[in-house]
């Protein structure tokens, strides 16, 4: 288990995050409060990992109460599981943001550490996943990722992994360009969601690059 120092939520910090992701009062801001914890266990000598080969696999957020400027919070984390896969390892990390002894936000992150030989072999293609026919969406919106968004997001989020900010490094680990932070992809995609949402869960299936266009489609299910 890992405990981070108490964090005061500066309103300018929240505003900077919102401006970068283009969403006032972004639901995803709490992810920025746990970055010190990630830095802590990544540097733990008992946990050996090549951060340069890490990508975000899945993210869950559960909201118990809203955060406000000048809140003093205490982030906590624990490693829930480490799974070995043919193409690498998955690290499952649970996190909690505490305020006055109460859980305000729960998070769960599944991080995928790509193996050294995870690229498809020549002529090898992954089978496409079947599309689910949901009918026409109730609404949709599109955003084109600016060239400098990975760099700008690295500031307020604290996610400055060089695969997001250093082109040469990104190429050295197999990407053709820097890639957008998974949590930035999540924040941009979640921009039209209601602020009283109780839970959000996402799965990242492929990297998002500067210049890509993200389209968020929403289907109402009657609930």
Predicted regions and their residues:
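Short, surface-exposed helix-loop/turn micro-motifs enriched in polar/charged residues
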Residues: 25, 87-89, 196-200
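HotDog/MaoC-like acyl-thioester-processing domains
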Residues: 58-145, 204-210, 215-223
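Hydrophobic residues on conserved beta-strands that form the core of alpha/beta folds
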Residues: 4, 106, 197-199
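Hot-dog-fold acyl-thioester-processing enzymes
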Residues: 1-58, 118-125, 130-194
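Beta-strand-rich recognition/accessory modules
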Residues: 186, 192-193, 199-200, 204-212
């Amino acid at each position: 288990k890992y405990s981070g120092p108490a964090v005061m939520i500066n309103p300018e910090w929240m505003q900077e995050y919102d401006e970068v992701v283009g969403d006032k009062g972004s639901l995803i801001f709490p992810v920025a409060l746990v970055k010190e914890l990630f830095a802590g266990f990544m540097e733990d000598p008992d946990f050996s990992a090549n951060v340069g080969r890490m990508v975000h696999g899945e993210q869950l957020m559960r909201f118990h109460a809203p955060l406000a400027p000048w809140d003093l919070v205490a982030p906590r984390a624990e490693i829930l599981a480490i799974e070995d896969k043919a193409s690498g390892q998955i690290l499952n990390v649970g996190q909690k943001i505490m305020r006055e002894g109460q859980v305000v936000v729960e998070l769960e992150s599944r991080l995928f550490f790509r193996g050294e030989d995870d690229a498809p072999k020549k002529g090898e293609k992954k089978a496409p996943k079947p599309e689910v026919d949901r009918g026409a969406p109730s609404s949709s919106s599109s955003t084109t990722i600016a060239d400098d968004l990975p760099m700008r997001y690295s500031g307020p989020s604290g996610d400055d992994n060089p695969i997001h900010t250093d082109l040469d490094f990104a190429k050295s680990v197999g990407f053709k360009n820097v890639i957008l932070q998974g949590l930035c992809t999540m924040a941009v995609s979640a921009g039209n969601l209601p602020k009283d949402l109780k839970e959000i869960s996402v799965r990242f299936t492929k990297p998002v690059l500067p210049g890509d266009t993200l389209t968020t489609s929403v289907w109402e299910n009657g609930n």
